[in-house]
Regions:
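Non-catalytic signal-transmission and effector/linker regions of two-component phosphorelay proteins
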Residues: 1-11, 42, 106-120
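Short hydrophobic/Thr-rich beta-strand motif most characteristic of the beta2 strand and flanking loop
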Residues: 31-39, 46
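Charged docking surfaces used in two-component/phosphorelay signaling
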Residues: 21-25
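A Lys-centered signature of the CheY-like receiver
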Residues: 103
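Conserved acidic carboxylate
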Residues: 14
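The feature encodes the CheY-like receiver
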Residues: 62
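Active-site residues of response regulator receiver
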Residues: 58
Length: 120
């Protein structure tokens, strides 16, 4: 059995508490350590310094966009996927080529996205 230190660490930026709790459980069951942030400031703090391997970023975090977090992750070479209920045309053009999990998504879609990030 893996110890927490051996598990890939994922930053989960999600402001909907119930969804965040469900995702945290699903991710932990799939073998990830999870660092959660529901607000942009906390997400930025974790993105800048935490030892994370990948991230799921809700685009809208309590009325603030997570694009600054994505810039930090990109600078650190940490892969990420956006999670959004927005239609593609509502995502700024500069970010449309990034991986986007369209809400609602299922376990299969989540696992495929995360596997793709880890293999990239």
């Amino acid at each position: 059995m893996s110890t927490d230190e051996n598990m890939p660490c994922i930053l989960l930026a999600e402001d909907e508490m119930l969804l965040a709790m469900m995702l945290e459980d699903r991710l932990h069951t799939s073998g990830y350590r999870v660092l959660k942030a529901a607000r942009l400031a906390k997400c930025m703090e974790l993105a800048e310094s935490a030892p994370i391997d990948l991230a799921i970023l809700d685009i809208n975090l309590a009325g603030e966009v997570s694009f600054p977090v994505a810039l930090v992750l990109r600078r650190r070479g940490i892969p990420f996927v956006f999670s959004s209920g927005y239609d593609e045309q509502d995502v700024p053009e500069a970010w449309r080529n990034e991986n986007i999990l369209q809400k609602p998504y299922d376990s299969r879609q989540l696992n495929a996205a995360l596997t793709g990030l880890l293999e990239a």
